[in-house]
């Protein structure tokens, strides 16, 4: 369980950014400790019957296969060749690919557990995440999420547009290798973006 908590929750959700903005919002604006949120997410992933539970099963079964059935360590990425990613990277890739389903679950469980609406925060989290699938270059938000998240500014009501710069990849495997395999570049998971306040 502690292995999955680190490799299946903390690394994909925080380090690879899937719920980093959401967790930071809950912490800074509502006093929910990061470790408490991720422990809750772990319990939900383990015992629910949604997509996050399916990924929990895939991740832990892959680990068992590696340890006890002498199979190659890690997993391949859907649509790829025989290149195996560590399970935390493979889980992150699955979460990225199914990001809308992931956020549906996250929004729902956060509302039930904390009575906090994180729909717009999740929308911002997705917007700045370096996803392989195409998405709009600019989105409008009601708060200054970009400067709040990246520059520790006070979160205020402020209609603004966040314009992202898409990264180009040869294919899904090239994307996965850049984000989930090569090195440990800080905030590699987030796109370069600018915040434009409405006049």
Identify the residue ranges that each predicted region occupies.
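Radical SAM enzyme core and accessory elements
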Residues: 1-199
């Amino acid at each position: 369980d502690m292995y999955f908590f680190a490799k299946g929750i903390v690394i994909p959700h925080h380090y690879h950014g899937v719920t980093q903005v959401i967790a930071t919002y809950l912490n800074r604006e509502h006093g929910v400790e990061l470790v408490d949120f991720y422990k809750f997410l772990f319990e939900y992933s383990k015992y629910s019957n949604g997509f996050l539970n399916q990924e929990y099963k895939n991740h832990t079964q892959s680990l068992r296969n590696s340890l006890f059935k002498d199979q190659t360590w890690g997993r391949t990425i859907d649509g790829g060749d025989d290149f195996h990613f560590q399970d935390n990277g493979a889980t992150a890739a699955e979460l990225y690919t199914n990001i809308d389903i992931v956020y549906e679950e996250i929004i729902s469980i956060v509302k039930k557990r904390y009575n906090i609406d994180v729909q717009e925060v999740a929308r911002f989290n997705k917007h700045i995440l370096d996803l392989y699938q195409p998405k709009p270059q600019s989105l409008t938000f009601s708060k200054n999420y970009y400067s709040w998240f990246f520059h520790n500014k006070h979160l205020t009501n402020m209609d603004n547009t966040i314009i992202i710069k898409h990264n180009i990849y040869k294919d899904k495997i090239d994307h996965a290798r850049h984000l989930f395999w090569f090195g440990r570049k800080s905030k590699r998971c987030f796109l370069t973006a600018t915040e434009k306040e409405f006049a």
